[in-house]
């Protein structure tokens, strides 16, 4: 900065007379220069312009020289200018001055004030560097990080270069000569004001225009100018969309409807499909339950297959509705994309926007036909398809299987042991025990081909019968006994007595006779489960009923004595 004085403080050297020179020299000797320090900005007067140099006197013994190139506007002799003192006395005895650094110091001071106040500064982006751009702040170079350029990525950075625009100073470090600025902060501040204004006006049902800002797996974020909204995948189209990128592109202009606005969180939910009429309102009439149709397979899922009903509308055939014979059949094994199939409409859910279909119900259920031809009790012969740890699978035709559980192989022997005697492919004779159409299950049995040998035992030793048994074996968990020297029975340890201290198998001996009550019969083995405890409790209750006294003066010992006397 230069200031032209109305009166020249020092006339041109050619006009200075000898007398004035002596007076001026004396005056300089008396001037106090202690306040002038290196690395500071002071005012000086231009005393001569010689060749490419501007000679400036700052009040020191020696004048300083500054290249003309450091001045934006060349001063005149006599002008007062601010200069930066590099060194008071250099190698050649001259004072080293700088006009550029003086201007920069002044600018730094102004920028520091603006930074502390949070004020914006004007600048121009003029270059690209690693990680960002360089900005000219009226002579001071600042760094603009790439992350601080805009609120969203800019495809063509040249569109914002060499244009004077406002910036916000983020940080200043004079020692490192480093200033970091932000263009994004300016945009966000103006955007924040516009955002508040827009949020105050936004309402559900409004139709707005926006730009696709970001695409994710679950939807797309739409820039509405000053605020973003979420367009969920399910609100893009009434038809099926697997990924938003199938119908949307980055920076694409779209028209959307505000379908939900949360005033607390300020979240905006958007929809495109809501701009059109809901096809589901008429779908129920168009596709009534029970209607048979044909359509193409469009997509597979772990739980079923999708079939096109018409353009933009699909229905789901659940895995359980593909075949009568395999409840959770993998659709990829029997169907292909684009394949034409026949199906029937099972349900139209207008709220969840789902159409449930069935392929198998267009065909006759082979299990129903099997049940008609082979009712329960029918004896059949069929080849063994597979043998597992728990039973035998038998081929019934039409890819149907029936199962013989290992417990239904023999009345007497363990089924798990007998499984080893069967081979895959062998023909086996069995009886139809049960048919469950809904669960698609046929239960078969081999042992049912012959009478139950334990049925006679079950008839003779009914539950509650009091019997006498002979102890054949004493075990830790109870007593093995024999009834009528032919039927096996067992008394559990806990059933030996109603007194806990008497529930000890070791108190009994082999060949000792014991009286007990029939509790249950294991039909598969014919073994009878007995209880001494239940027998004693029943006897006690009976005695109380028959011999008890209404005046409660008779004790339990008397009652039992009377009962025993009667038995004699």
From Swiss-Prot:
GO molecular-function terms, A-Z: mRNA binding; structural constituent of ribosome
Say yes or no: keyword Ribosomal protein present. Answer: yes
Q: Which PROSITE patterns match?
A: S1
Q: Which Pfam families match?
A: S1
Q: Which residues form the S1 motif domain?
A: 39-100, 118-184, 205-273, 290-360, 377-447, 464-533
Q: What does this protein do?
A: Binds mRNA; thus facilitating recognition of the initiation point. It is needed to translate mRNA with a short Shine-Dalgarno (SD) purine-rich sequence.
Could you identify this protein by its name?
A: Small ribosomal subunit protein bS1
């Amino acid at each position: 900065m230069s200031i032209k004085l109305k009166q020249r403080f020092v006339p041109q050297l050619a006009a200075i007379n000898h007398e004035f020179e002596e007076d001026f020299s004396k005056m300089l000797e008396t001037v106090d220069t202690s306040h002038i320090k290196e690395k500071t900005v002071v005012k000086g007067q231009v005393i001569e312009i010689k060749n490419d140099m501007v000679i400036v006197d700052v009040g020191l013994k020696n004048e300083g020289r500054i290249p003309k190139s450091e001045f934006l506007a060349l001063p005149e002799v006599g002008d007062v200018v601010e200069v930066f003192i590099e060194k008071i006395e250099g190698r050649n005895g001259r004072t080293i001055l700088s006009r550029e650094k003086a201007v920069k110091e002044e600018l730094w001071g102004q920028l520091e004030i603006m930074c502390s106040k949070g004020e914006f500064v004007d600048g121009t982006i003029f270059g690209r560097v690693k990680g960002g751009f360089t900005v000219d702040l009226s002579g001071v170079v600042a760094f603009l990080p790439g992350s601080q350029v805009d609120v969203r990525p800019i495809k063509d950075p040249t569109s914002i270069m060499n244009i004077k625009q406002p910036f916000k100073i983020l940080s200043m470090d004079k020692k490192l000569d480093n200033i970091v600025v932000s263009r994004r902060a300016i945009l966000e501040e103006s955007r924040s004001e516009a955002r508040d204004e827009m949020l105050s006006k936004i309402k559900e049902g409004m139709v707005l225009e926006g730009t696709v800002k970001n695409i994710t797996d679950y939807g797309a974020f739409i820039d509405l100018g000053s605020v973003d909204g979420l367009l969920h995948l399910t609100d893009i189209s009434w038809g099926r969309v697997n990924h938003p990128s199938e119908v949307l592109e980055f920076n694409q202009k779209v028209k959307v409807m505000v379908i939900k606005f949360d005033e607390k969180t300020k979240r905006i939910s958007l929809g495109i499909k809501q701009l059109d009429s809901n096809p589901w309102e008429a779908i129920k009439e168009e596709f009534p339950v029970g209607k048979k149709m044909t359509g193409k397979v469009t997509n597979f899922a772990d739980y079923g297959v999708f079939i096109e009903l018409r353009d933009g509308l699909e229905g789901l055939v659940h895995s359980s509705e593909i075949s009568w014979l395999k409840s959770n059949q993998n659709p990829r094994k029997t169907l292909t994309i684009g394949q034409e199939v026949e199906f029937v409409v099972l349900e139209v859910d207008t709220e969840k926007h789902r159409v449930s279909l069935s392929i198998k119900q267009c065909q006759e259920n082979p299990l129903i036909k099997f049940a008609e031809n082979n009712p329960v009790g029918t004896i059949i012969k069929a080849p063994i398809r597979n043998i597992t740890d728990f039973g035998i699978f038998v081929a019934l035709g039409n890819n149907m299987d029936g199962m013989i559980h290992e417990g239904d192989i023999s009345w007497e022997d363990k089924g798990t042991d007998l499984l080893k005697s069967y081979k895959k492919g062998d023909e086996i004779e069995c009886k139809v025990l049960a048919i469950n159409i809904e669960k698609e299950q046929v239960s078969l049995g081999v042992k049912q081909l012959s009478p139950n040998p334990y049925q006679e035992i079950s008839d003779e030793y009914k539950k509650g019968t009091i019997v006498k048994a002979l102890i054949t074996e004493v075990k830790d968990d109870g007593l093995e006994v024999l009834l009528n020297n032919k039927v096996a029975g067992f008394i559990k340890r806990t059933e030996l007595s109603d007194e806990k201290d008497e529930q000890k198998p070791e108190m009994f001996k082999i060949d000792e006779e014991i009286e007990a009550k029939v509790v249950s019969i294991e039909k598969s083995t014919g073994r009878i489960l007995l209880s001494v405890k239940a027998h004693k409790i029943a006897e006690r209750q009976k005695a109380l009923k028959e011999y008890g006294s209404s005046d409660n003066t008779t004790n339990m010992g008397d009652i039992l004595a009377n009962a025993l006397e009667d038995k004699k």
